[in-house]
Design a protein with these regions (language model features):
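A late C-terminal transmembrane helix in Major Facilitator Superfamily
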Residues: 345-379, 386
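Extracytoplasmic gate region of multi-pass secondary transporters
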Residues: 45-46, 227-271, 278-279
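Helix-breaking motifs and short loop linkers at transmembrane-helix boundaries and internal kinks
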Residues: 57, 89, 110-112, 260, ...
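Intracellular juxtamembrane helix-capping segments at the cytosolic ends
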Residues: 130-143, 330-344
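Cytoplasmic helix-loop-helix junction between adjacent transmembrane helices
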Residues: 120-155
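Helix-loop-helix hairpin linking two adjacent transmembrane segments in secondary transporters
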Residues: 151-203
Length: 408
């Protein structure tokens, strides 16, 4: 039996000056671009990692301190996103997050010492975590069809595809990894302008929100943390995001350093991974309608296992990475889309804010663990380790389906 959620009146934040209805597509465009930026910021690191290793004389184990440094920012976002949004509003929270992320990426490029990059990782984690949680809550609160959340996460896939493609192309043109980060910072900075425009013009779809008062936001967060299905969803998505991040961070190193594939070919093969990912996100609405959400995740996990086995045992072929990207694409957004069916309505913002930010922990914890193991066992152990993660996701997903959905 699920515990009863806290009750209480909610308060709506509205502009004191009535304005004409604003086009909904503007807010959706901002949301989509926000996910492109976090996709680029996260995925570009994989191609730049060997250059960073060389610059600071690091090993696959010691470079993982960069991943670890992001954890504190992700944790802070996990426990504060719903409270910040209820106090400041969605748009101001996104502005803070965009400034934070831009600052972190630019500082990566400026860092003259390894400890500076490690320290700034906290800001990067905080910025990504707040953007992720805020945009997911905004979209899920307004959408009634799977296609919206699928399209949102497809744009993350576009960013994840662009990150390695941009980094590889700029490196081939003679830029160094620091200059690549300056380009990425410029791309992220455009989000600051978009969100600032929303605040200045008081764009209603993002300024008008029904959120629990600060007291009830805290109560709903506490309730979410006591709900088993929220905790299990967070753990499931943590492993899922960790798997995505491990592929993004380490696949290029496996392809180029371990398997001696030319740098340009290896870089674009990672872009192929994210092309498959993006196609999967774009097809999400159709797949959910035809298969149902639970069956879709089951099929995705099976396909993911097949792709990882082929990447491990058949290193010379080109189909495994796009297949892996396509397979993993539906898992995260489908799980988020199911959340309103699994928890009471009042708890949805806190639950989504918690699980998305906790999931972001996986982007630091799991690639870090894989790096330390690979430093001892060799880079070719990475495909096997990621396969074990896929098996773990299958076990967790079975636990989620046994929890069921709300019957009210």
């Amino acid at each position: 039996m699920k515990p009863n959620p806290p009750t209480g009146k909610t308060s709506s934040r509205r502009s004191p000056h009535p304005e004409a209805p604003a086009p909904a597509w503007i807010g959706i465009a901002i949301a989509f671009y926000a996910f492109i930026t976090i996709g680029i910021a996260e995925s570009g690191l994989g191609v730049l990692l060997p250059s960073i290793l060389e610059t600071f004389d690091l090993t696959p184990a010691t470079v993982t301190f960069l991943f670890i440094s992001q954890i504190s920012g992700y944790v802070l976002a996990a426990f504060s996103s719903s409270l910040i949004s209820s106090r400041l509003g969605l748009a101001p929270m996104l502005l803070v997050a965009a400034i934070t992320l831009t600052t972190a990426v630019a500082t990566y490029g400026l860092a003259t010492a390894w400890f500076i990059m490690v320290a700034v990782g906290t800001l990067l984690g905080l910025g990504i975590g707040l953007i992720d949680a805020g945009i997911n809550t905004y979209m899920v609160s307004d959408q009634q069809e799977a296609k919206w959340i699928g399209l949102l996460h497809a744009f993350y896939g576009i960013g994840a595809f662009l990150g390695p493609a941009i980094a590889t192309t700029l490196l081939m043109l003679g830029l160094n990894w620091r200059q690549v980060y300056f380009v990425i910072a410029t791309i992220v900075a455009l989000l600051i302008g978009g969100v600032a425009w929303i605040i200045i013009t008081r764009y209603q779809p993002m300024m008008v929100q029904t959120a629990a008062s600060n007291t009830h936001a805290l109560a709903n967060l506490r309730f979410a943390l006591k709900t088993p299905i929220v905790l299990l969803s967070g753990l499931f998505l943590l492993v899922n995001v960790g798997t995505e991040a491990s592929l993004g961070n380490w696949a290029y190193t496996v392809q180029h350093v371990s398997r001696n594939i030319p740098a340009s070919t290896a870089g674009y093969s990672i872009s192929a991974l994210w092309i498959g990912f993006t196609i999967g996100r774009l097809m999400l609405g159709v797949l959910v309608n035809r298969l149902g959400a639970i069956r879709l995740v089951n099929g995705s996990l099976a396909m993911l296992a097949v792709g990882l086995v082929s990447w491990w045992l058949l290193p010379g072929q080109w189909l495994s990475l796009p297949l892996i990207g396509f397979a993993i694409a539906a898992i995260f957004p489908t799980t988020i889309w199911l959340m309103p069916q699994r928890v009471p309505t009042a708890v949805v913002p806190a639950a989504i804010g918690f699980v998305t930010s906790v999931a972001s922990l996986g982007a630091a914890i799991i690639p870090t663990a894989i790096g330390w193991i690979a430093a001892r066992a060799g880079l070719e152990s990475i495909p096997v380790l990621i396969l074990l993660l896929a098996i773990g996701m299958a076990v967790l997903h079975r636990g989620l389906t046994q929890q069921g959905t709300l019957s009210n």
